[in-house]
Amino acid sequence: IIFTTPHNKNMMDTFIVEDYLKFLKMISIYTDFYDFTGYNTITTENINYYESSHYRENVGKLIAARIFNDKSVEVPEDFGVLVTKDNIDEHLENLRKQIKEYDLNKVLE
């Protein structure tokens, strides 16, 4: 099982977005994977992280619940997407939209 780590918003803010999205596209050519990146209810809350790249145990439990479809754990709807070669383009567009909305909200604050 392959998945992307859910980087904290502060780490995501440093990414060269289009390069990162190309990386995700390349992964999808070879295998399906779960993507936990982006700006979502988990990655935008600093409490879920020790610092910008290391998430806390509760986040790990959410990742496992999403991957193994554990209905006993309430996983936020916006956290974790199974990405395939068939849905990668739609997923990348959704990430671009998330990033633009997050950036706009930062400016408006």
Describe each model-derived feature in a short phrase.
Residues I29-D32, E45-N46, F79:
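Generic structural motif recognizing short loop/turn segments at the entrances and edges of beta-strands
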Residues M26, R66, N94, Q98:
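Residues that form generic nucleotide/phosphate-binding pockets
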Residues Y20-F23, Y34-T37, I42-T43, N48-Y55, ...:
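C-terminal soluble interaction/assembly domains
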Residues N8, T43-E45, T84:
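Alpha-helix initiation/capping motif
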Residues N48-E93:
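Histidine-centered active-site loop/cap adjacent to the catalytic His
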Residues F15-M26, S53-H54, K61, A65, ...:
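Compositional signal for N-terminal targeting/processing segments
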Residues E90-E109:
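Charge-patterned, long linear interaction tracts outside catalytic cores
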Residues I1-D32:
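Conserved, well-ordered alpha-helix/loop/beta-strand core segments that scaffold catalytic motifs
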